Amino acid sequence: MTPASFTPLRDLPPASGWGRGDVLVLFGELFGRGYANGLIDAARRAGMTVVGATVGRRDGAGPLRPLSDPEFAQAETALGGKIVNVPLEAGFDLEPPGDGPSPVEQLKGVRPDAWQTPLDWSLVERARAAGARRLDAATASFAAALAPLVPSGANVLFVHTMAGGFPRARVYMPLMTRLFRGTGEKYLSSEAFWASDLGRLCAASFEEVTARTFRALVNATAGLRAGDRRVRYVAYGYHGCEVLAGETPTWQTYVPYLQGWAKLQLEEHARDAWREGVRCTVFDAPEIWTNSSALFLGVELSLYALLRALDREGPRAPATEAIRARCRALLAPDGSLEGLLERADAYLAAPQWAPFRRLEGWPHHSTAAQLEAMLSASEACSAMSADPRNPVAGELSRAAVEAVGRLMLDASWEPDAPVRWLGHDVVARRLIR
């Protein structure tokens, strides 16, 4: 794998040439609001047509199927555009290997305190191969169904949104709680878990869902790259983020980020495609607050530093003043933005956590002390918002989603590298200008 070299986008890209008649194609299904919504909003403002996708559905433990007519109608209404109804579920956790139980079936009845239970890896590998074949066939069908929806001469922007891949076995959820929120006796070392068979299964599943899907997309859509049309690919990565901790630009990361190894594979697939002449970029985006953040407490700590980046880039800019005002309105009576930043900095800039701020060796595993310090900082900062369901971090996330969408749309027109970091500096510049 190519060693990581820090390649941040520093300057605002010029306005793109995407416009009316061009098509943005989602490869992955939208559930709730997240980064992809910012790019969709920017594309629609440019006049682009948006075409969506689905991962399909399962009825209980039944086989994967397309959306039913009511599900399909509801999905198209929610997207506000057409959806290609080919089930693109990636991964292999429910995949029967042909002559034995699926990985999830192997784990049926395993208790959380038996997380070191061994798996039959010959069955796991056969299930993985079967899942990969299923996805490749589905992606080819997706590309064939998509082709008539792309007008002749239209430019196309593919947006890879596939991520995740936690195996759907009951044993995992209590383990995830211990891994990401456990302190004291409930702490579970991410390194120890990652070395177990359950951890290895997670790693393989993440790679199939988060990373290999990008390669499958590029391969299946080769036909659309023929001719004079401009075809670009973007994907959402994460590889830490540079923020202002105090007054110092600092690369930092959420720990433990178990999908990190799969995100590295995603970057590698983009580099391989770039060398083959495919214009694509994985954008390593900042941390935001999403529906899943309740499990990953602490991921939002670096987000508060966006306020400091806005102050540095344009302290009196209308966007800076508006965002600060909206954030202040969400504070508890005894909270302040200055207090929020000070408490977040106490974790982000603490000397004892400097080893976790090294790009080299990323992703990093947790320690009991580091996780406890991060969770304590998260709890203290969250308490400064009046409503935990509408926190300051949520407002800053909405700003980041908007800016990242605009940055990705513009940068994708003439991409200059297969991997680009988006730090708070360029996000703040985009919001201000």
Annotated model-derived regions:
Residues T2, F6, P13-P14, V299-R433:
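Long, compositionally biased intrinsically disordered regions
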Residues P3-A61:
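Canonical Rossmann dinucleotide-binding motif of NAD(H)/NADP(H)-dependent dehydrogenases/reductases
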Residues P8-L12, G34-L39, A138-P148, V156, ...:
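Short alpha-helical segments and helix-capping/turn motifs at coil-helix boundaries
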Residues D22-V23, A154-L157, R232:
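Structural motif
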Residues T49, A53-A127:
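Glycine-rich phosphate-binding loop and adjoining beta1-alpha1-beta2 segment
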Residues R58-P66, R170, P174-G277, V282-L301, ...:
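Catalytic loop of short-chain dehydrogenase/reductase
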Residues G91-L123, P167-R200:
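Short acidic, low-complexity segments enriched in Ser/Thr/Gly/Pro
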Residues G100-H160, G165-F166:
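A glycine-rich helix->loop->beta "capping" turn
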